[in-house]
Amino acid sequence: MDLILSFLLFILFCIDYYYVYYSSIHKYKRLNERQKAYIMSIKSSITLLILSMFVNIKYFGNFSFGFSDLTVINLGILNLIAYFFMDCVIGTKEYYKYLLSLSGYIHHIIYIIVSIVCIKLNIILPYMLFFVEELPTLILSLGKFNNNLRNDNLFGSTFFITRIL
């Protein structure tokens, strides 16, 4: 994918995250700052988890990856970059204190750089294999967004299975 097309797709993904965030806070007016901080994280985690599961099934099932598969993976990485960028942009205005930790700006900037390097070096396939690690992130984000969905045991076990083993 050439640079101009990648940039335009990145812009479209940014618009998508902007729309998802602001339509969510408009629709659910009682969301507190903490809940608002996890809206885009939930969307990004679901997207990456599904895409990573697809990649892992094909990879470990010894199926070949065609041009369309690699294009979708590239789109997934551009979507991830857009998430990190928009989380920093929107978060600066809407939920600043939730971006101050190591999981905020520093984490996002490092992952933007790593993602761009992976695209540039054409190593997006092995990079995408590891995004099954988004499962505990999704569980954590859902629990932070809605306390009824919080499950520390499920988070802990998925964290252990996907990130430690």
Question: What is each model feature region?
Answer:
Residues 1-133, 137-165:
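Membrane-helix and juxtamembrane interface regions of eukaryotic multi-pass membrane proteins
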